[in-house]
């Protein structure tokens, strides 16, 4: 098989990557096949069925074409791509395969963000959307996310159906794609008009309203991704000009030269921003990840001190400040959060008389619930968020949307600044009045086949053993979403969980929870801690050492 792939290497788009890889890395591309998971496909570049290249991308496109042609007539699809290596080329490969199978592909001629893709699907009323991105993964990764006609990522049932079509294609080397330029000429491939972007901007500006105070200077960085110049254009059109772009870090570049990892969850990504803040006397640094679905920020205050806010804290701030922003609107509000989001979010929502809705991890579940909630005209969304720095205030899109959140944060920062208040003081006020939960997320990595077995062993051991105490804390309940049951560890009584089944276990204590699940896109196990304790770091270290690393 490898020889046949090598014969076609010039058409693979990844020849240069392959030739710089070690023999072990090259061989890994022929061990198994890429699987379309709950978050689509994400992988490193390389030759072979287990890596991203022109042929495996065509395979996904053909599977999607077969899936759509089976379910709808005259299907159409929007395709966007980010600033990563080969993103544009992959988008054209997919468009050609779709067009060759009778599906109209609407593509962008320049990089776009994930929230723009979600909005475009809804705005253009197409049957599906494709986003070529690996979000905040390292530079040697890329990926494909598929969206349904509502603009949300595919739910498990649809994802499984699509996966069956993709997996049924045995020889991706033989997939016909037709001529891209010919399809453009005959209209099967169309370039998206600027009207879509303008409509999206209009919706975002409507959400923000106006930015009346302008004294707080803000630094923006796209981490070499897609949020600029769109965000700066929106701010300018809102007549807010007191921002500075970190130019070196905002050049579109899939090599991500100024950061080790282009992830606003990583405080190290703000190094250049902090240096620029020192020079410009800016009070806030906002960073978005490469496909602009996630954001993070650091506040500069006092005598040149900096405060980094984690994903839960940003969500809490947005909840409180947006609630205050909507005080003149008497419409009942609801919020949505994932089950691994801070316990403090529910307490804050309850104190604000806001309805709380829990969903599984993955913004697709938030999107699906919003779709149902939107049919209820009596309630409006306050905020939907996950602890992993993903937020949505106005459901103009159906995925995490950093583009709409940046100008909202700028507005709130200036309103606070006008009253001599900082984000730091605001979050401390929440802790003082609502409770001081400390939240941490760890993601130990276990590479290769041995890593897969290790992660399976960890989940199996926690699932099959009776656990009454963890790190000195009594376990009150164990929620096992894989079997769909919650067990009361005091009475032994079990009940059915109401949320869909997924590979996640959550241990409930009197003072919070610890949860764990395998990552859907990387060889990692995600560990979530939300506890009302002082020694959170001691607990996380003890848990990882005694309950994760010791399991064989």
Curated annotation (Swiss-Prot):
Q: How is the cofactor bound?
A: Binds 1 Mg(2+) ion per subunit.
Q: Which family, according to the similarity comment?
A: Belongs to the phosphohexose mutase family.
Which gene name does the record give?
pgcA
Identify the enzyme class.
Answer: isomerase
| MF annotations from Gene Ontology | magnesium ion binding; phosphoglucomutase activity; phosphopentomutase activity
Query: Which Gene3D superfamilies would you find in this protein's record?
Result: Alpha-D-Glucose-1,6-Bisphosphate, subunit A, domain 3, Alpha-D-phosphohexomutase, C-terminal domain
Pathway note: Glycolipid metabolism; diglucosyl-diacylglycerol biosynthesis
Query: What domain of life?
Result: Bacteria
Q: Which GO terms describe its biological process?
A: enterobacterial common antigen biosynthetic process; glucose metabolic process; purine ribonucleoside salvage
**EC id:** 5.4.2.2
The answer to whether UniProt assigns keyword Phosphoprotein to this entry is yes
The protein's job, in short, is: Catalyzes the interconversion between glucose-6-phosphate and alpha-glucose-1-phosphate. This is the first step in the biosynthesis of diglucosyl-diacylglycerol (Glc2-DAG), i.e. a glycolipid found in the membrane, which is also used as a membrane anchor for lipoteichoic acid (LTA).
Q: What is the active site of this protein?
A: 135 (phosphoserine intermediate)
Q: Which cofactor does it need?
A: Mg(2+)
Q: Which SUPFAM superfamilies match?
A: Phosphoglucomutase, C-terminal domain, Phosphoglucomutase, first 3 domains
Catalyzed reactions per annotation: alpha-D-glucose 1-phosphate = alpha-D-glucose 6-phosphate
Q: List the PROSITE patterns.
A: PGM_PMM
Sorted alphabetically, the keyword list is: Carbohydrate metabolism, Glucose metabolism, Isomerase, Magnesium, Metal-binding, Phosphoprotein
What name goes with this protein? Phosphoglucomutase
